[in-house]
A protein has these predicted regions:
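Extracytoplasmic/secreted cell-surface and envelope-processing proteins
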Residues: 76-78, 146-153, 174-179, 243-247, ...
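Noncatalytic luminal/extracellular "stalk/propeptide" segments of secretory-pathway proteins
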Residues: 37-137, 141-142, 146
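Metal-dependent peptidase/peptidase-like ectodomains
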Residues: 276, 285-343
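Bacterial Sec-dependent N-terminal signal peptides
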Residues: 1-22
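Catalytic-core environment of secreted peptidases
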Residues: 20-36, 41, 52-60, 64, ...
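Soluble metallo-hydrolase cores and metallopeptidase-like ectodomains found primarily
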Residues: 103-111, 116-122, 170-253, 269, ...
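Loop/turn elements at helix/coil->beta-strand transitions in domains of secreted/extracellular proteins
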Residues: 26, 133-137, 161-165, 229-233, ...
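Acidic, glycine-rich active-site loops and adjacent beta-strand->loop/helix elements
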Residues: 143-144, 171-173, 239-241, 284-291, ...
Length: 343
């Protein structure tokens, strides 16, 4: 444990020299660039980034670099993404975003606004079954739906309700996820900003999705040999991100998580020049924003036996300057927590 705590201290307090910091920033800039289209699965962005990461590990002096392939199912949005409300065009990622499980949808639809002050689920169902609103898009505050989960769940089924989809206003900054993108559901959900019109008449959409079945991606595993090989330390970070929302919009993911990926490459470069006591492994996971698929696959198919790992550091979203840094330990690692607080 003494050696473990010394390693934690070294990792947490090491001062990067100017050359290391410049290299770190260069990696973040590279992985956030348009050539990787948000490191998602449309246009093979994640795999292009993974190939670059593998080359970079080799370039900085890693003794071994391995690509560990696995497959996943994932929904993507690389095509048309046009939304207009009463003729006014909305900008993807700015005025609206989608749920990751959305199907494609094309057409012009009436808007049905839920009466949240006098909410009556049965009346809502009756309205949506009427000739006036049959096939409409339903507009409601997202948090309101949480209070009436069962009532709104029915709107997601074509069998139970004829609405074309849902438009949810949200007070929070608009978010785009991948965690539930392994399936495509029956109806689309759009998230829009709170300033979405309160009395618009129609919404015209042309949204294309592309579902990738058994898409092959890979983890990148680099090893820097130490003096001892009976156990090891592991640094991990995921390199995939959210990818594209239409043809022109992509999420660069500098913070989440080019920052963590750049850190483990920088650490690999350090240990390649300064031979450690134990073997060091640096794992860049893919499929992480898509429900932890890369790390799950590694646990099931470890390159090095999990029992030989003395300690694992996972670096995620480390590029902000928030004075409150968040660190999470499992029960086994709690002995190091007091030292972390002290640092």
């Amino acid at each position: 444990m003494k050696k473990l705590l010394l390693l934690i201290l070294a990792v947490m307090t090491v001062q990067l020299n100017a050359q290391d910091l410049a290299h770190y920033k260069k990696i973040v800039k590279e992985l956030s660039s348009a050539k990787y289209q948000g490191r998602g699965y449309a246009e093979d962005g994640a795999n292009k980034a993974g190939k670059w990461i593998a080359k970079e590990f080799a370039k900085v002096g890693a003794d071994e670099v391995t690509c560990q392939p696995f497959k996943l199912n994932i929904n993507t949005f690389p095509g048309k993404m046009d939304v207009r409300v009463d003729g006014k065009k909305l900008t993807p990622g700015v005025d609206f975003t989608l749920r990751e499980f959305n199907p494609g949808l094309k057409g012009e639809f009436k808007l049905y606004y839920v009466d949240m002050e006098n909410f009556d689920a049965e009346k809502m169902y009756a309205d949506l079954a009427s000739p006036e609103y049959q096939g409409a898009m339903v507009v409601c505050d997202f948090m309101f739906t949480y209070k009436h989960t069962e009532a709104f769940r029915k709107l997601a089924s074509k069998k139970d309700c004829s609405n074309a989809g849902m438009v949810y206003t949200w007070e929070e900054p608009l978010k785009f996820y991948k965690a539930y993108g392994e399936v495509v559901r029956e109806k689309p959900i759009l998230w829009v900003k709170p300033d979405f019109p309160k009395n618009a008449k129609t919404i015209k959409v042309n949204m294309e999705n592309k579902f990738l079945q058994d898409y092959e991606c890979f983890n990148v595993i680099a090893k820097v040999e130490g003096n001892r090989h009976d156990s090891c330390y592991v640094f991990t970070a995921h390199y995939d991100h959210l990818g594209k929302l239409g043809k022109k919009t992509f999420y660069p993911g500098a913070h989440d998580n080019a920052s963590g990926t750049a850190a483990i490459i920088t650490f690999a470069a350090h240990y390649a020049k300064n031979k450690p006591e134990f073997d060091m492994y640096f794992i860049a996971f893919s499929g992480e924003d898509a429900n932890l698929r890369g790390s799950d696959w590694y646990v099931e198919h470890p390159i090095v036996p999990l029992s030989q790992i003395k300690f694992l550091f996972n670096l995620d979203m480390i590029a902000d300057n928030n004075p409150k840094q968040y660190c999470e330990f499992n029960d086994v690692a709690m002995e190091g927590y007091a030292l972390f607080e002290k640092i």
